[in-house]
Amino acid sequence: MDFLGLPTILLLVCISCFLIAAWRSTSQRGKEPPGPTPIPIIGNVFQLNPWDLMESFKELSKKYGPIFTIHLGPKKVVVLYGYDVVKEALIDNGEAFSGRGNLPLFEKVFKGTGIVTSNGESWRQMRRFALTTLRDFGMGKKSIEERIQEEARFLVERIRNTHEKPFNPTVFLMHAVSNIICSTVFGDRFDYEDKKFLDLIEMLDENERYQNRIQTQLYNFFPTILDYLPGPHKTLIKSIETVDDFITEIIRAHQESFDASCPRDFIDAFINKMQQEKENSYFTVESLTRTTLDLFLAGTGTTSTTLRYGLLILLKHPEIEEKMHKEIDRVVGRDRSPCMADRSQLPYTDAVIHEIQRFIDFLPVNLPRAVIKDTKLRDYFIPKDTMIFPLLSPILQDCKEFPNPEKFDPGHFLNANGTFRKSNYFMPFSAGKRICAGEGLARMELFLFLTSILQNFSLKPVKDRKDIDISPIVTSAANIPRPYEVSFIPR
């Protein structure tokens, strides 16, 4: 036998070294989370029930444990099921899990700017600025709390003018909540009949409807295919672009009338930052537009839907409404507006508001995260940029923390002596570094709007209370209340 030539020997040595290095790398990385075998291109889509994703995830967690992998189309997703593992990821390893999962639909619209869908330094700077600016001070002459109190008075007067006639409260609540964003971001509220305001509300409502469609969600996992097909995803993109144009107009007007010595609102604060830090490439008109758009899209539908769902639940449970009336009358009375300082003296009312958020479980799947580096979670390796679903529903519905979680019970947030009970499992705003930037604003709105309504009105259903259905309409993204009408009876 001829001896192997030197080039052949060198080639074999190189291949051997490569294989050893690859083996060592794999062994050091460890195994990735288990999961069902995906079908090429399609993934595990047919193994999931789009109308009851939580039940599908529950069954998969029983088989594979609290950390498992699914494939949505060609995209790999690691699902985290249960409080312990979600806390371990989002809080204990917050930096590693601080990325936002890549969503092609919103990438088309936001182009990596704003707060909700951006990543890296852009996200850090926009979030830090928004949190600082939205704090309850330094926003012109009125604090955010005062703006909400003022809007609550307008809402109460508008409800009073219905003269006890039954109506669907959706529009009233959406107008009130949207006006808080308008007041904070644009510097002033709109009259409820203002044509420009009504057009904005219609666009926001349309966005919410189309965003909850299953075809829209599928676009994020099959963008190449759905780009060639008509559907709600294309309507949503056009609708968001229309809101974008609306905001751009207002920003242009602000730039023309801007006075650095007298900032009026969020937009002025941003323009001031742009002028102070001209070398900072993250503070641009485009990023201002997208950040403002974020505040509207994230801050209007979620809060108004929670209020609407809360009123429906109180229609079903008049005994809970009555306890809230008595507590509000005792602490606040009828001669002044409720304020945030009252909350600590209203433990039952506070517990009801927390229970509304827990019970409705508005975003069961949560907004997707991503790991920003190769990460180990328990015994598993998760490669950089992997999309993460840190599920909220199993936490808010945990039967050990909240006995009989399917039942609406303010006692879930009350101690035996009637004081308010905090729970680490209360995560409707998510958790960790990506916790909702508008959490503080939303909490204020929910408390001040609901207490103001109940201070002034009793709720009267249009049908027998036993026929009121408080189970949600489950969409592909959110749980929303069933349509209903209510009469507001002055107290």
UniProtKB/Swiss-Prot annotation:
PROSITE patterns named among the record's database cross-references: CYTOCHROME_P450 (PS00086)
SUPFAM superfamilies: Cytochrome P450
Localization: Endoplasmic reticulum membrane; Microsome membrane
Enzyme Commission (EC) number: 1.14.14.1
Gene Ontology molecular-function annotations: arachidonate epoxygenase activity; heme binding; iron ion binding; oxidoreductase activity, acting on paired donors, with incorporation or reduction of molecular oxygen, reduced flavin or flavoprotein as one donor, and incorporation of one atom of oxygen
Chemical reaction(s) catalysed: an organic molecule + reduced [NADPH--hemoprotein reductase] + O2 = an alcohol + oxidized [NADPH--hemoprotein reductase] + H2O + H(+)
Coiled-coil stretches noted in the UniProt entry, renumbered to this chain: none
Family the entry assigns: Belongs to the cytochrome P450 family.
Protein name: Cytochrome P450 2H2
Species name: Gallus gallus (Chicken)
